[in-house]
């Protein structure tokens, strides 16, 4: 029985790299992007995070909030790494909508919302009924291995960033109306139709670093930024995991040598 289980597990692992079934079924197409932060030693590309922040600010922020992301983290070394004065200026210029979640920013004496400061979070934005994007990269899965096993995540991660980028480039241009709502065909969305109009077309923003701003690159940049927003401490966790594995390896080696030195000579002896 155990032999059969071992053979089955080995067979599943052999198939895992090739198995890339989309989350929720086989009718989605999730493209496998080569993000810099993937893998055990991957790190965020600071320039890409800055470009993604620009895409969010100039495009996505019109409908989506990031209310669980502190503005001060934009200066983090492992994040976008903006200078502190630039973060303060960015915060002060960010528009705040009149929503219940933003009431703590309301100045009753001046009868208006006060400007944001770097110790605040990004403001909430539910005006269009759109979801908050703070944790969207963790709540969406692009890859699954053989059903129920989750083996593909071992090699590729859950694919939240891939799902977001694939969604951005997955619009086919086809539209239909259902119950008075315009739906847009999207090859990455479950069911194939989504109520969100295409947010990106390519050349939507002008990057200061001169980087290509076609649709594919804009999609990659916003996906990477949202992955950082959801997992700002990913690099620290990877480092801690590496140190933990190294420590356990050394400990296991010492225990083996101790056993060999102290107990191995006495094993098998008859008393």
Where would I find each of the regions flagged by the language model?
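Membrane-proximal low-complexity regions enriched in glycine and acidic/polar residues
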Residues: 98-190
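N-terminal signal peptide c-region/cleavage motif recognized by signal peptidases
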Residues: 15-19
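Extended, hydrophilic extramembrane loops/domains of integral membrane proteins
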Residues: 188, 194-231
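Detector for the c-type heme attachment site
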Residues: 64-69, 197, 201
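The canonical Cys-X-X-Cys-His
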Residues: 56-67, 222
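Electrostatic cytochrome c docking/interface patches
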Residues: 29-54, 65-79, 210-212, 230-238
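Juxtamembrane interface at the cytosolic side of transmembrane helices
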Residues: 237-271
């Amino acid at each position: 029985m155990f032999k059969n289980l071992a053979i089955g597990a080995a067979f599943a692992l052999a198939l895992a790299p090739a198995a890339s079934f989309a989350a929720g079924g086989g009718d989605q197409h999730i493209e496998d992007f080569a993000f810099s932060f993937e893998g055990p030693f991957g790190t965020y590309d600071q320039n890409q995070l800055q470009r993604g922040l620009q895409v969010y600010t100039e495009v996505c922020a019109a409908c989506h909030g990031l209310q669980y992301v502190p503005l001060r983290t934009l200066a983090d070394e492992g994040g976008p790494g903006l200078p502190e004065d630039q973060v303060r200026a960015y915060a002060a210029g960010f528009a705040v909508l009149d929503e219940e979640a933003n009431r703590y920013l309301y100045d009753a004496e001046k009868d208006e919302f006060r400007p944001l400061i770097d110790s605040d979070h990004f403001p909430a934005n539910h005006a269009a009924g759109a979801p908050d994007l703070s944790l969207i990269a963790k709540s969406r899965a692009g890859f699954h291995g053989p059903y129920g096993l989750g083996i593909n995540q071992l090699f590729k991660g859950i694919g939240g960033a891939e799902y977001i980028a694939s969604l951005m480039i997955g619009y086919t241009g086809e539209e239909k109306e259902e119950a008075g709502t315009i739906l847009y065909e999207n090859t990455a969305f479950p069911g194939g139709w989504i109520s969100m109009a295409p947010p990106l077309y390519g050349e939507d923003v002008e990057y200061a670093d001169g980087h290509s701003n076609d649709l594919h690159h804009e999609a990659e940049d916003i996906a990477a930024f949202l992955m950082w927003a959801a997992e700002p401490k990913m690099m620290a966790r990877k480092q801690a995991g590496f140190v933990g594995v190294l420590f356990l390896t050394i400990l296991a080696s010492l225990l083996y040598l101790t056993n060999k030195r102290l107990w191995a000579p006495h094993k098998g002896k008859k008393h």
